Design a protein with these regions (language model features):
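Short, charge/polar-rich alpha-helical segments
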Residues: 3-5, 38-41
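Amphipathic alpha-helical repeat scaffolds
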Residues: 16-20, 34, 38, 54, ...
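Charged, low-complexity interaction regions
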Residues: 20-29, 41-45, 58-68, 85
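TPR/TPR-like alpha-solenoid repeats
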Residues: 36-39, 74-77, 81-84
Length: 91
């Protein structure tokens, strides 16, 4: 699934590549992108990952466990990325 076992790239680079292959709008993609946004905090990619996750979340079916979990991670990512501005998770 993740390619060559002898891959010398950093885990974050491999995670970003793996996340790009997830189905857009799936709970897996929202959760993965939100976690990656937190991990990339302080980099230009962090906000882009967060925004992509936010757009994907708009397609999630409400009321499922998977949606709740993904949206909770998205909320945490927003809180962590936007804490300084006081926007509390809202883009």
């Amino acid at each position: 699934m993740f390619g060559n076992r002898n891959d010398e790239r950093l885990p974050l680079q491999r995670a970003l590549e793996a996340a790009a292959s997830l189905k857009p709008g799936s709970w897996e993609s929202v959760e993965s992108l939100a976690v990656l946004a937190i991990e990339c905090k302080g980099t230009p990619e962090a906000e882009q990952l967060y925004q992509t996750a936010s757009r994907a979340a708009a397609q999630l079916k409400a009321g499922t466990y998977d949606a709740v979990r993904a949206l909770a991670w998205l909320s945490r990512a927003g809180r962590e990325l936007h804490a300084v501005s006081g926007r509390g998770g809202e883009p």
